[in-house]
Structures are given as C-alpha cells and as structure tokens.
UniProtKB/Swiss-Prot annotation:
Residue ranges of the TM segments: 11-31, 253-273, 283-303
Low complexity bias (residue ranges): 103-115
Membrane topology, record value: Multi-pass membrane protein
Protein name (record): Transmembrane and ubiquitin-like domain-containing protein 1
Entry function: May contribute to the regulation of translation during cell-cycle progression. May contribute to the regulation of cell proliferation. The membrane form is involved in sterol-regulated ubiquitination and degradation of HMG-CoA reductase HMGCR. May be involved in centrosome assembly.
InterPro entries in UniProt: TMUB1/2, Ubiquitin-like_dom, Ubiquitin-like_domsf
Composition-biased stretches (Polar residues): 63-93, 132-149
Region named Disordered: 39-162
Domain named Ubiquitin-like: residues: 169-242
Length: 308
C-alpha cells in the first residue's frame, strides 16, 4: 500500500529528501557569518628611548664577531674525534665474521649463521644406503633469533605417510562375524559415500562404529573424524532401516518466546524505577503513579502465570 494514494513511494521519498536538504541549506545560509580578521594596534615608541636602544644595539656584537672570537682549539678537537672514530671503525671491520671448521665425523660451516652435518656411516645398512641426520640452523647475531630446519631419515612409517599425503588411506571394516574387509577411501569422502560405495542398497541399514561411538552424522568426512591409515571401523547391518536426521530434528526445538515476555517486562519496569530514583525531576506525580500501577499489574500477571 502506497503512503500517498496515486503517488509511488519512490517519488514520495525523493521529494522528502529534497525538502530535507533544502531546509538544511536554508538553515545554514541564515546562520552563516563571516569571520573578521583581528585588528592589530601598533603602539608608537617614545622618542626618549631612541638613544638607549641605539646604545644597546651597538653594545651587542654581531654573529660574525661571535664566530670570529670562538675558541681556536675547537677545530683541533673535532679533527681528533673524527680520526679516533675512523680508527675504531677500521678495527671493528677487521674483526672476522665467519668461522669454518671441519671434523672427522661431519662438517660445520658458519657465515653469520651455522650449518651442522653429522654423518651416520656407522649406522648405515650393508648395501651402502644411509639415512643421515641433517640439521641446518641459521642465527641472526643482531636480533638474537634462531630458526632451524631439521631432516631425519624416514623409518617404517614411510608408506603410511606417503598414502596420507596422496589423499587416500586404507580402512578396515570389521563385521560381527570377525570378518574384515580392506577398503581404500579418500580423506574428503563422507560416511554416506562410503556406505553407498561399499554397501549399495543397504546404506540406510549399515551402521559404522569408530572407537565405541556410533557415527550418526553421515555428512562427516574421513579427515574430520581423524581416521588414519589402518583404522578399524566396526560395521553392523540392522534389519530395520534407520531414519537419517531424526536427532537433528529433535535438537532443533523452536524457542517459545512467550516464556520470555514476563522477564522482559520486569526488566523494563526495573529500568524505569531506576531512572525515577536517579532523575526524579523527569517524572511527575502522574507518571510515578502510572509506573506504580504498571508494576502491580506485571506482578499479578507473573504470579498467576507461575502459580499455574
């Protein structure tokens, strides 16, 4: 329904804005005043003080005279300070910043930092392959901070880590009759995808259990459940199909706003009484009487609702 019959709301809003800005402009023009520059009055100097000022002017030496009468030993002191600072800079520059050392077991090289290498020839297998421990560390002598990068040889978990890096892992599905089934899944696969892939037509009857907890949410992914390579999922195939999403529907209970009405009214009444005690000049006798009656009414409503 339009605000004015026969006229669109857009036209009404436009004219209201134009009228508002026109009122602002008229108010600004009517109250605008020009700022005047401050007036400076020059006080004439008395004639008697002319001679004294001239004598004082002749008494004070000029800047050139001050520079001429300066101490001649200042140039010598400045030149000696500059020579001493240059010698200290050369001595500091001659200090070595890099150290190189070699040992029989490994090597250490440092140039503003350090690189350490420790050989592991004694622990190498007979075929000649070795897994050295390699440590690289860089240090900042000025900031005092250090960062290190360490690399160590991989052990028996190389295959599992490579499989997880590739994004696929192997899961063991264990049934009630102690039979197992090895499946390959991706980290981004969901529980419903696993059920549909390996239990086609039975995804509503299959229940997966991991570490004693039933996986109810079929939208969870393998990575969110923190499943690793070789993890065991217990499978139970029930005779009755489970209805998905029942727990979620029960959890989303609508909020009853009617229960919050009485506490909200009590809060408003308390705020009004606080204002009445702090600022009594704002409340007349009639307003105070109405506030008291409203408080009694709210109290009666609250008592009757909670008494039932």
């Amino acid at each position: 329904m339009a605000l004015i019959e026969g006229v669109g709301d857009e036209v009404t809003v436009l004219f209201a804005l134009v009228l508002f800005f026109m009122v602002l402009m008229l108010a600004w023009v009517s109250t605008h005043t020009t700022e005047r520059a401050p007036t400076h009055w020059i006080r004439p100097e008395p004639a008697q003080g002319g001679a004294s000022s001239n004598s004082q002017r002749d008494f004070h030496p000029g800047p050139s005279q001050t520079l001429t009468n300066a101490d001649p030993n200042s140039e010598t002191v400045d030149s000696s300070d500059s020579t001493q600072s240059s010698r200290e800079f050369q001595n500091a520059g001659a200090t070595p910043h890099s150290e190189v050392a070699f040992s029989s077991s490994g090597s250490t090289v440092s140039t503003g930092g350090s690189v350490e290498y420790t050989g592991a020839a004694a622990d190498s297998p007979p075929d000649g392959e070795s897994h050295p421990n390699f440590t690289v560390s860089s240090r900042d002598p000025q900031a005092g901070a250090s960062s290190s990068l360490r690399y160590r040889g991989l052990g028996d978990g190389t295959t599992a880590q490579s499989a997880e890096e590739a994004g696929t892992i192997h899961l063991r599905l264990k049934f009630l009759n102690d039979t197992e089934r090895l499946v390959t899944v991706r980290l981004s696969d969901t529980i419903m995808y696993i059920k549909r892939t390996y239990f086609p037509g039975q995804e509503l009857r299959v229940r997966l259990i991991f570490q004693g907890q039933l996986l109810r949410d079929d939208s969870q992914t393998v990575s969110s459940l923190q499943l690793r390579d070789g993890s065991v999922l217990h499978c139970h195939i029930s005779q009755h199909a489970s209805v998905p999403g029942v727990g979620a529907d029960q959890a989303n209970v609508p909020l009853n706003v009617g229960n919050l009405l009485v506490p909200l009214l009590f809060l408003i009444v308390m705020l009004l009484w606080y204002c009445q005690f702090q600022y009594p000049s704002l409340f007349t006798g009639t307003a105070t009487a109405c506030l008291g009656g409203f408080t009694l009414l709210i109290s009666a409503i609250a008592f009757s609702s909670y008494h039932r």
